[in-house]
From Swiss-Prot:
Glycans are attached at N5. GO terms for molecular function: G protein-coupled receptor activity; odorant binding; olfactory receptor activity. Residues 1-25, 76-99, 161-196, 259-271 are extracellular. This is Olfactory receptor 5K2. Gene3D superfamilies: Rhodopsin 7-helix transmembrane proteins. It comes from Homo sapiens. Disulfide bonds join C97-C189. InterPro entries: GPCR_Rhodpsn, GPCR_Rhodpsn_7TM, Olfact_rcpt. Keywords: Cell membrane, Disulfide bond, G-protein coupled receptor, Glycoprotein, Membrane, Olfaction, Receptor, Sensory transduction, Transducer, Transmembrane, Transmembrane helix. It is a multi-pass membrane protein. The lineage of its organism: Eukaryota, Metazoa, Chordata, Craniata, Vertebrata. Residues 47-54, 121-139, 218-237, 293-316 are cytoplasmic.
Amino acid sequence: MVEENHTMKNEFILTGFTDHPELKTLLFVVFFAIYLITVVGNISLVALIFTHCRLHTPMYIFLGNLALVDSCCACAITPKMLENFFSEGKRISLYECAVQFYFLCTVETADCFLLAAVAYDRYVAICNPLQYHIMMSKKLCIQMTTGAFIAGNLHSMIHVGLVFRLVFCGLNHINHFYCDTLPLYRLSCVDPFINELVLFIFSGSVQVFTIGSVLISYLYILLTIFRMKSKEGRAKAFSTCASHFSSVSLFYGSIFFLYIRPNLLEEGGNDIPAAILFTIVVPLLNPFIYSLRNKEVISVLRKILLKIKSQGSVNK
């Protein structure tokens, strides 16, 4: 009987959104549109950076990887969420949960380190422009990017491995729209203290290191900007950093609320708005934040549009 109960509770029901038929249809359309825009926007930015030699610099390599990470985040969460709007059971197995969280944790941890790498790149470009190619070499850029993804994989392996020490024998309703670790911990019949402690330590360490790197970089950047005598130089430096800082604020604000706050295991209705911001809104906005405020990207886009327009005129 114990074995039967244990097996039965290896399947869960996601109950994060409304069951109202009209609202379900509306939400499906909205989130499907967001999903398409997110994937197309981010993949387009990756393709733009990959295909134009002018953008093969450390900053754009980091931005390209951030765009790739954001598209992976959308692909890890949204398809199952859209399926559940019209699925009667809204069921997800423990193994599906583990896979979904593994990919989400990997890409979001990589995101943290990539954002810190972009901050360091901006620090070198603004505070030490003459030494930029020495301090921010292509080799270092590749090492930082590779390290971000390795750290993401290791971080997710730890948490996914610890999920399988838990036993689920009570309610199997997850009050969320995707399978995160905290909602699973709330359903565990085994005390999840170790899981919660490891989550707090490792997620906290990642946050402290990456946020610390971002803040220190921006502190030096601000000090350098205020010392600039040229108004044009100051405006250009502010413009360069504004888009990155906007993305950092949205991303870290939501992730801090989700994983670093006290009383993590309290019932998670309040998790959903922050999770929507973290997993859906931020990946949607990032390609527009990075491209629309970036003169290099806009310049390349204009050249592409002019080329397409001129080719169209010739064909006519």
